[in-house]
Amino acid sequence: MTQPLFRGAATALVTPLRDGKVDVDALRRLVEQQLENGVAALVSCGTTGEPSTLSLEERELVIRETVKAVNGRVPVICGTGANCTQAVIDNERRFRDLGCAAQLVVTPYYNKTSQEGLYAHFMAIAEHTELPIILYNVPSRTTLEILPDTLRRLIPSGRFIALKEASANLSLVLEKLDAIDGRLTLYSGNDDLTYPLLAMGAQGVISVVSNVLPGEMAALCQAYFDGDA
């Protein structure tokens, strides 16, 4: 079984703004609040951080300041996803030296490509980037589902380390777990499905609600791991 990058609750950070600009002081306070409450990792400029509405310069600033504030205490994961393959590659090249442990890559949105197109998209990213890749499946937002057979084809490249799964179709999640066969770490991508996915073998959650309830989400995961949930 693959060694997880983190175990427990990670927070997909919001991006604090004031007067139309990134509020760096508020971001630093948010990071410190998260760490004081036991989160296991942070995601900077994932989709919760609204990167599609930020400039590249703003995204780089947010990621850099997050890494700086964390100062090595937990892994930081940067969001590089886009609906353009080359844009993802360019984003990773821009962010790769900022100190992140991995990149989170959401499936392309709006384009509604085929599974073959999805495979080609992710394999191009795998070939032309350096940071380890966490796949992000969120069909309610993107209309695309990474199917089990596509996972089977992607995994042998060795570039993919985890799947953030935000599908409510638990039967399909079970099929994906069979396809993964311990070669990727599974994380819940839906707060309300954290407990069911932990019971199915997930190693934690990449959470939105932990922006305001970090201690509670960290405690939920730890209680499950300790057999107290």
Residue ranges, per PLM feature:
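Active-site beta->alpha loop and helix N-cap motifs at the rims of alpha/beta catalytic domains
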Residues: 2-11, 15-145
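Catalytic alpha/beta core domains of metabolic enzymes, predominantly
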Residues: 127-128, 139-229
